[in-house]
């Protein structure tokens, strides 16, 4: 089976894509944050865990800032955010804490109640010999703690101003 056939087969059972427009980035982020929270609530209710892949860029940053309020509003106190796992759809191989790292977007979500242990970060050069070592460690983390069958509940994708997709 070719990769294209596999993608087509897996996509057949998924809801159809839709395009929703809003007049401002703030409104887009509020809508996306609310939908993200709804999907993660459903996942945690069904399986006890929910997996979210975040992205960077200006829209990804704005969305990450809107997420803590949406998640705390969406989850009842008895649920909490302990079942949420955060991953990063694109990341840079730079030291931990570097301003260019997208994993810094997790700070507000950790403050809201997502356990730090559930933030799955790419190792930087201070912990990994090279980018291949870092990727191997993240692959092992994904195999151990990632979503069943590799299906994330929500994946945020960004499209930069130059039309480059961040996947």
How would you name each of these model-derived features?
Residues 67-75, 110:
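Active-site catalytic pocket residues across diverse enzymes, especially alpha/beta-hydrolases
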Residues 48-55, 153-155:
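Short glycine-rich phosphate-binding loop at a beta-alpha junction
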Residues 2-16, 78-156:
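Ligand-binding beta-strand-loop-alpha-helix segment within the catalytic cores
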Residues 44-47, 73-81:
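Phosphate-handling active-site elements
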Residues 1-52, 145:
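N-terminal glycine-/serine-/threonine-rich phosphate-binding loop
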Residues 54-59, 157-161:
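Glycine-rich beta-strand-to-loop/alpha-helix junction loops that act as flexible
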């Amino acid at each position: 089976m070719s990769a294209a056939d596999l993608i087509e087969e897996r996509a057949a059972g998924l809801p159809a894509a839709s395009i929703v427009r809003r007049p401002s980035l703030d409104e887009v982020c509020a809508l996306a944050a609310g939908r993200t929270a709804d999907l993660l609530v459903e996942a945690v209710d069904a399986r006890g865990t929910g997996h979210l892949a975040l992205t960077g860029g200006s829209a990804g940053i704005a969305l990450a800032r809107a997420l803590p309020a949406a998640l705390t509003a969406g989850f009842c106190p008895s649920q909490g955010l302990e079942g949420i796992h955060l991953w990063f759809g694109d990341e840079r191989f730079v030291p931990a804490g570097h301003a260019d790292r997208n994993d810094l977007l997790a700070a507000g979500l950790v403050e809201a109640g997502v356990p730090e242990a559930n933030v799955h970060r790419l190792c930087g050069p201070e912990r990994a010999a090279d980018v291949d070592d870092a990727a191997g460690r993240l692959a092992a983390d994904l195999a151990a703690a990632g979503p069943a069958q590799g299906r994330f509940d929500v994946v945020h994708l960004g499209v930069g101003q130059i039309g480059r997709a961040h996947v």
